[in-house]
Regions:
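A donor-sugar binding/catalytic signature common to diverse glycosyltransferases
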Residues: 93-94, 116, 146, 271-310
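Conserved nucleotide-sugar phosphate-binding/catalytic loop shared by glycosyltransferases and other
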Residues: 29-74, 78
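A short, histidine- and acid-enriched strand-loop-helix "catalytic/donor-clamping" loop
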Residues: 116-130
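Leloir-type glycosyltransferase catalytic cores
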Residues: 152, 316-367
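A nucleotide-sugar donor-handling region in carbohydrate enzymes
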Residues: 37, 41-42, 142-213, 318, ...
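N-terminal subdomain of nucleotide-sugar transferases
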Residues: 1-38
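Donor-nucleotide binding loops and adjacent catalytic segments primarily
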Residues: 40, 45-47, 66, 184-275
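Membrane-proximal helix-turn-helix segments that form the acceptor-binding/catalytic region
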Residues: 133-145
């Protein structure tokens, strides 16, 4: 039996690692151990419930306004104790969070192989996104198995000197999760407030580098788009960060056709996205998920580590400039050809069977 420990701490990690955990649980040659760090405890728990993931350990590190250094050090120390007790054959981490980096370091100190799910993404700008770009680069220096979502991310790793035999193009597990969560008969109170003929725009924005002036610029653009285009309704699940909530409430809080709602669980979000006309986001995971829904995505960032979607035509980088965001949205609202050029493309990120591939590759690697 191979003991495989899966470690994650945030909502996006939970969504993307849940299919892997389920695939591990369904394999009778594997002993799975699941650890959550609690980096985003309040937002993570609903994901665990939806996918029926029952952690064996919870570090419960969540504290208000703690620094990145404190998060990283608490995970590093907490994982030291768990790895000493469990002695897994391999540790799986995901993506680019502080949990990812600290867990990889702790496993390295214990001479335990690390498998990096969603390896090889790069912007080549260490401060964009911050701190994620450096987290994933450092994790990829430590890892032993690299599960790259696309050929481009695999090539990034090989160009950095990673052995080709240790790099595997698997697709992205978020597509596996999307197949699990979409429901044809989905209902939500938010949808009851929006006339079917209205064009629903789904907005998400929360990244550290966008907080403050960039976020305010985007929100003002959204406000004016709604005022000038009566067919538009905006749904914005507002992140729990006080820095996000205060600006959202100040600029968007009193507009009838802007619906500021609590953060949505993954089922609600995926199904609202599937019914949207357009999505604006600074999220990484959404850039991968939503092209499967044939919904155009405007990315509220200046850089992306997911250029495959841009190259495929499903995503467009628009940054946070007021005029640029406003023009991009209104172009898609009023130009059917432009809209169809973005909507009618295939998703380059996977087929929904990534988790199965990863488990198979782990078993091969450990033999």
């Amino acid at each position: 039996m191979i003991k495989v420990m899966t470690v994650f701490g945030t909502r996006p990690e939970g969504i993307k690692m849940a299919p892997v955990i389920k695939a591990l649980e369904n394999d009778d040659t594997v002993t799975p151990v699941t650890v959550v760090t609690g980096q985003q405890q309040e937002m993570l728990q609903p994901i665990l419930d939806i996918f029926d993931v029952k952690p064996d350990y919870d570090l419960a590190i969540m504290e208000p306004k703690q620094s990145l250094a404190k998060i990283t050090s608490k995970v590093l120390l907490g994982m030291d104790d768990i790895l000493t007790a469990e002695k897994p054959d391999v540790v799986l981490v995901h993506g680019d969070t502080s949990t990812t980096l600290a867990t990889s370091m702790s496993a390295f100190f214990h001479h335990i192989p690390v498998g990096h799910v969603e390896a090889g993404l790069r912007t080549w700008d260490k401060y964009s996104p911050f701190p994620e770009e450096i987290n994933r680069q450092m994790t990829d220096r430590i890892a032993d198995m690299y599960f790259a979502p696309t050929l481009l991310s695999a090539n990034n790793l090989i160009q950095e000197g990673v052995e080709t035999d240790n790099v595997f193009v698997t697709g992205n597990t978020v597509i596996d999760a999307l197949h699990y969560t979409l429901h044809k008969d989905y209902k939500n109170p938010v949808l009851d407030q929006i006339h079917p003929e209205q064009k629903m725009v789904l907005l998400t924005m929360h990244r550290r580098e966008n907080q403050g002036a960039p976020m305010a610029r985007v929100f003002r653009a959204i406000r004016d788009i709604v005022f000038e285009n009566p067919e538009v309704e905006v749904v914005y699940p507002v992140h729990l960060s006080p820095a996000v909530q205060s600006v959202a409430t100040e600029i968007l809080g009193d507009i009838d056709r802007v619906h500021l709602v609590e953060p949505l669980d993954v089922v609600d979000f995926h199904n609202l996205a599937a019914r949207s006309y357009l999505i604006l986001t600074d999220s990484g995971g959404i850039q991968e998920e939503e092209p499967s829904l044939n919904v155009p995505v405007l990315v509220l960032r200046d850089t992306t580590e997911r250029p495959e979607g841009v190259d495929a035509g499903t995503l467009r980088l628009v940054g946070t400039d007021y005029q640029t965001v406003k023009a991009a949205v209104e172009g898609l609202l009023h130009d059917e050809t432009q809209y169809r050029d973005m909507a009618d493309n295939t998703n380059p990120y996977g087929d929904g069977h990534t988790a199965e591939r990863i488990v198979h590759l782990i078993k091969q690697f450990m033999m």
